[in-house]
Amino acid sequence: MAKQSAIEQDGSIIEALSNAMFRVELENGHIVIAHISGKMRMHYIKLLPGDKVKLEMSPYDLSKARITYRY
């Protein structure tokens, strides 16, 4: 069986949590917990509440996501 592809969504950061985790509100109104991708950590990209971001979500767990891009 092939691996399911990630779902890409846009959202905005509501709150910064501990351990580089963020509470993010998606464009459709849902709220998810997201962490920063490895490349963003390597390049020290800072995120603040109010920033618009692109997220990748697994089709198996839609309550968690990975932040892959900051607009």
From Swiss-Prot:
Domain S1-like: 1-71
Transmembrane domains' residue ranges: none
Keyword annotations from UniProtKB, A to Z: Cytoplasm, Initiation factor, Protein biosynthesis, RNA-binding, rRNA-binding
Signal peptide from the UniProt entry: none
InterPro entries reported for this sequence: NA-bd_OB-fold, RNA-binding_domain_S1_IF1, TIF_IF1
Matches recorded under Pfam families: eIF-1a (PF01176)
Subcellular localization(s) per the UniProt record: Cytoplasm
CDD domains linked to this entry: S1_IF1 (cd04451)
GO CC terms in record: cytosol
Record's function text: One of the essential components for the initiation of protein synthesis. Stabilizes the binding of IF-2 and IF-3 on the 30S subunit to which N-formylmethionyl-tRNA(fMet) subsequently binds. Helps modulate mRNA selection, yielding the 30S pre-initiation complex (PIC). Upon addition of the 50S ribosomal subunit IF-1, IF-2 and IF-3 are released leaving the mature 70S translation initiation complex.
Family per record: Belongs to the IF-1 family.
UniProt xrefs under NCBIfam families: infA
Identification of the protein by name: Translation initiation factor IF-1
